Amino acid sequence: MTTENLNLPVRQYQKQYKGILSAVFEATKAFAGVTSAIQILDGVQHNAKAFSVKTNATPVVVGEYSTDANVAFGTGTANSSRFGQMKEVIYADTDVDYDYALSIHEGIDRYTVNNDLNAAIADRLKLQSEAQTREVNKRVGKFLSDNAGKTETLADFNEASVRKLFNDLSAYYVNTEVIAPVTVYLRSELFNAIVDMTANTTSKGSSVSIDNNGLAKYKGFTLVETPAQYFDTGVVAIFSPDGIVIPFIGINTARTIEAIDFDGVVLQAAAKGGTFILDDNKKAIVKVTSVALGG
C-alpha cells in the first residue's frame, strides 16, 4: 500500500475528536455517578502508561502519649519517646496503564458522499464517538464487576428477597463507614421488582410512580435503571458511591489524508483507554448477581 500523498496536506482533527468524544461521553455514559468526568488527552506519546498517582500504604496507628517516668526520662533518656514509635510516611508513584484501544478507519468519496466533506467528517466523528461511548460503557461495567469488594447473590426477584438484599447492604455500608451517598445501577428486572413492591406506598413516604414506572430511592439508595448490555454476565446491579472511578482516553491521532484510490479523504483515528480506581475504594463497590440471570 502506498503512503505517498502528492504533497497534499494531512489535516489533523485531534482537538475536534477530543471535544466531541468528551461531550458525547458525558451526555450518554452509563454508571454516570460512579465515574468522574472522563479524562481525555490528545497527542499522547506513551504507548502504555496513561498517568501516575501518588499512593501511600503507611497504616495509621492511634497511639497513646506515655507519662512513664522512664520513657524519655530516667533510664529512657535519649533512647525512647513519649510519643511512641515513629513511622516514616513515604509516597510511591503508581503507574496507571492503558488497557484497550480504539480506532477509526473510514473513507469519504467526494463523488458519492452527497454532502459537504467537512460536514460529513463532523458527522462521522460524532457517530464514532457515540459508538465508542457505548463500548466504554461496557468496559466500565466489566471493570466495576471485576473490582467489586463484595458480591451478593439474589436468588429471585420476590419482594422478600429484594428487601433482604437492600437491608443487608444498608447495614454493610453503615458498618464499612462509607459516608458518601450510594447509587444503585440496576437492570430493568430488579428495578421493576422494586417499583412493584407492595410495601412502596405513599403512607410510608415512597415516591413510587406506576404511571411513570419510576422510583427515585429505596432504603436510602438512589436507583438508576441501566441497560442490561452494560452489565457483566449474570450481574443485575452495581452499588457504588459517586466519583470513585476514573475513565480515561489518550488520543494518538485523528486525521484525514487525501486518498489515492478514490476522489476523497481517508478518516483515521487511533486512541487508547482505560479505567482506574484506588484499591481503598473497592470495598465500597458491591455487585449483585442473579441466579435467574445465570449469575
Protein language model regions, located:
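Short, extreme N-terminal leader segments that mark the start of a protein/domain
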Residues: 1-29
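Extended, compositionally biased alpha-helical segments that mediate assembly or anchoring
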Residues: 2-13, 242-295
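Assembly/oligomerization interface modules of large self-assembling protein complexes
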Residues: 20-100
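Long, contiguous amphipathic alpha-helices that act as assembly "spine/axial" helices in icosahedral shell
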Residues: 87-152, 223, 260-271
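Helix N-cap / beta->alpha transition motif
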Residues: 103-110, 184-190, 220, 227, ...
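Extended, solvent-exposed, turn-rich assembly/linker loops in the middle of proteins
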Residues: 146-219
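Intrinsically disordered, low-complexity segments enriched in Gly and acidic/Ser/Thr residues
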Residues: 208-244
